[in-house]
From Swiss-Prot:
Gene name tied to this protein: pyrG
Name by which UniProt lists this protein: CTP synthase
Disulfide bonds: none
Gene Ontology annotations of biological process type: 'de novo' CTP biosynthetic process; pyrimidine nucleobase biosynthetic process
Catalytic activity: UTP + L-glutamine + ATP + H2O = CTP + L-glutamate + ADP + phosphate + 2 H(+); L-glutamine + H2O = L-glutamate + NH4(+); UTP + NH4(+) + ATP = CTP + ADP + phosphate + 2 H(+)
Organism, scientific name: Buchnera aphidicola subsp. Schizaphis graminum (strain Sg)
Length: 553
């Protein structure tokens, strides 16, 4: 089958939801038995998001093969079955880095290196490389049309239509159609100007997806079609919705998938969205509500915990209950402000870096452990649980992680042995030209062997699991025997190098910590066993209406 490409651009303003639109369209096309993959092209100069601030950029989504990517790839995996790889996301920085390496090697034979053709050719090569095993490749171009940063990407996708044939390319432009409340009108002018900007680059959009507070009426759609030179049935209205998982149905109801399949001359069955209809039904019919607290330090931007938040919601669907999420700054708990925790039915500490807010996290773990509140620790959250247990159950008050105190006397958490030479002295703030944080972690999918009588083994229903990782610190084995004698059990270790992967407290209603990131593999259709059981336990916690007596922690 001929490879077909759909390029998705955005106009007027940023943050319109190109990633959600691309993922939703991918879900509908996949439901027509088409093999789909989705790419994200980011116009920033960073090589990848791995060292970017979560408060600026949101979470870093880790793929199976260990690529640190844009959070939109998380949306892609939650909507379609295809797993993303390092090929599905690249940046301006990675393209320039690749071209400059080739120039240094002499690959260009002394040519003057320019944006056109060298940068644009590198972009096109990456897009084609990712398309090998797919029928349709959706490519989301980051940024907004008109931004200087996006120009090389836009030029590259313009050229691709010439290279592979215009009949094999669809350009979708996502644009804002604002509703002016005081006038009671929907305005089409911003969309017209955005398309004009795109035309000046040499790209005529085939489809317009119009984002608005309300459904864009047919008369306004006809007006947009006339001035933007697209068919009326290719002007799609995408209004604000309560749940992003309703969007595949919204697109199908407007026959967007039919238009695309007819354009590409694809003879495929109609989309079967029964799985998505089930998800929507579960959302609408969830009864009651539980409150889960996420204790972190990046709470100013909820997208910093995007996959965790979505995984909790997925687990709520499977338990037929609404999950209300409270993002709590761990620093606010450092003065023992436990009122922030008293109404929670479950406590989750996600991954993170650095020592800011650690005391608040330690107190939160102690509060959950001593008051029988379901606790879920992910990555750093597991390490914090071990430190807290060593300090307050075993009585080793100086127990700590070398991430927070490089000279600590009892390092229950330490750098992974293979990573100690990678980051040099960066953890102590001493940097030189060989120091590097980027790409120095244990990344991607790793196998883990589960202990037979553990809760984790019961939930996964298998002896060996494969989960994704992103860390450079591990549990130090030197105190583990003493820790296990006091009630905290090792429920799983990595097969390759015996790293502690899962911990449990058996005599607690629900207390699990994992070194990996299960949130990256949770989907609305399937959920994830750890999250599903965590929410089940939190639901039981509320049902039993435990009266918490705050202990002196």
């Amino acid at each position: 089958m001929t490879k077909n490409y759909i390029f998705i651009t955005g106009g007027v303003v940023s943050s319109l939801g190109k990633g959600i639109a691309a993922a939703s369209l991918g879900a509908v096309l996949e439901a027509r038995n088409l093999k789909i993959t989705i790419m994200k092209l980011d116009p920033y100069i960073n090589v990848d998001p791995g060292t970017m601030s979560p408060i600026q950029h949101g979470e870093v989504f880790v793929t199976e093969d260990g690529a640190e990517t844009d959070l939109d790839l998380g949306h892609y995996e939650r909507f379609i079955r295809t797993k993303m790889t390092c090929l599905n996301n690249f940046t301006t920085g990675s393209i320039y880095s690749e071209v400059l390496k080739k120039e240094r090697r002499g690959d260009y034979l002394g040519s003057t290196i320019q944006v056109i053709p060298h940068i644009t050719n590198a972009i096109k090569d990456r897009i084609i490389l990712c398309s090998k095993n797919s029928d349709i490749i959706l490519v989301e171009i980051g940024g907004t049309v008109g931004d200087i940063e996006s120009l090389p990407f836009l030029e590259a996708i313009r050229q691709l239509a010439v290279d592979i044939g215009r009949k094999n390319v669809i350009y979708i432009h996502l644009t804002l159609v604002p509703y002016i409340k005081t006038a009671g009108e929907i305005k089409t002018k911003p969309t017209q100007h955005s398309v004009k900007e795109l035309l000046s680059i040499g790209i005529q959009p085939d489809i317009l997806i119009c984002r608005s507070q309300k459904t864009v009426p047919i008369n306004e759609r006809k007006k947009i079609a006339l001035f933007c030179n697209v068919p009326v049935n290719a002007v799609i209205s995408l209004k604000d919705v309560d749940s992003i998982y309703t969007i595949p149905k919204l697109l199908k109801d407007q026959k967007l998938d039919n238009y695309i399949c007819e354009y590409f001359k694809l003879n495929v069955p109609q989309a079967d969205l029964k799985e998505w209809e089930k998800v929507i039904y579960e959302e609408k019919n969830a009864s009651k509500e539980i409150i889960i607290g996420i204790i972190g330090k990046y709470i100013k931007l909820p997208d910093a915990y995007k996959s965790v938040i979505e995984a909790l919601k997925h687990a709520g669907l499977k338990n037929k209950i609404k999950v209300k999420i409270e993002l709590i700054n761990s620093q606010e708990i450092e003065n023992k402000n436990f009122k922030l925790l008293q109404n929670l039915n479950g406590i989750l500490i996600p991954g993170g870096f650095g020592d800011r807010g650690i005391i608040g996290k330690l107190l939160s773990v102690q509060y959950a452990r001593e008051n029988n509140i379901p606790y879920f620790g992910i990555c750093l959250g597991m390490q914090i649980a071990i430190i807290e247990f060593a300090q307050n159950v075993i009585g080793i008050k100086e127990a700590n992680s070398t991430e927070f105190d490089p000279q600590c006397k009892f390092p229950v958490i330490d750098l992974i042995k293979t990573k100690k030479n990678d980051i040099k002295d960066t953890r102590q703030g001493k940097k030189n030209n060989k120091s590097n944080f980027g790409g120095t972690m244990r990344l991607g999918s790793q196998p883990c062997k589960l202990i037979f009588n553990s809760l984790s083994r019961k939930l996964y229903k298998k002896d060996t699991i494969i989960e994704r990782h992103r860390h450079r610190y591990e549990v130090n084995n030197f105190l583990l025997k003493k820790i296990e004698k006091n009630g905290l059990k090792i429920a799983g270790r990595s097969k390759k190098n015996n790293i502690v992967e899962i911990i449990e407290i058996f005599d607690h209603p629900w207390f699990i910590g994992c070194q990996f990131h299960p949130e990256f593999t949770s989907t609305p259709r399937d959920g994830h066993p750890l999250f599903i059981d965590f929410i089940k336990s939190a639901k039981k916690n509320k049902k039993n209406n435990f009266k918490i007596k705050v202990k002196n922690v």
